[in-house]
Amino acid sequence: DHVYGFSDQKKGNLMCLEFMTGKVAWMERVERELHKGAVHAADGMLYCLNENEGWVYLVEANPLGFREKGKFQLPKETTLRDENNGKVWSHPVVINGKLYLRDQDLIFCYNVKG
């Protein structure tokens, strides 16, 4: 019934829209770590990956409001992404309780089973 994603109007807005009407259910200005990127929904949660610094936010998929459950930053173990070069443009994926994230020439796997 709802769609979650980033607003292009202002940096740092994660938002929830009613699918049928396009009405904004909520819009949250998130810290600079999460101003633009990719969102994946799984098991009632949103896995939000920032394209610049590799921040990952776990947010409850709830049309009543923004509820952050946690965050972490991908380790900077690649030389292909630095302050002046490279973006994390891959999409997070959750399969069988495992969160997969790719950063340039690396892939990370995290256990996200509750």
Can you say where each PLM-predicted feature lies in the sequence?
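Noncatalytic, solvent-exposed loop/strand surfaces
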Residues: D1-G114
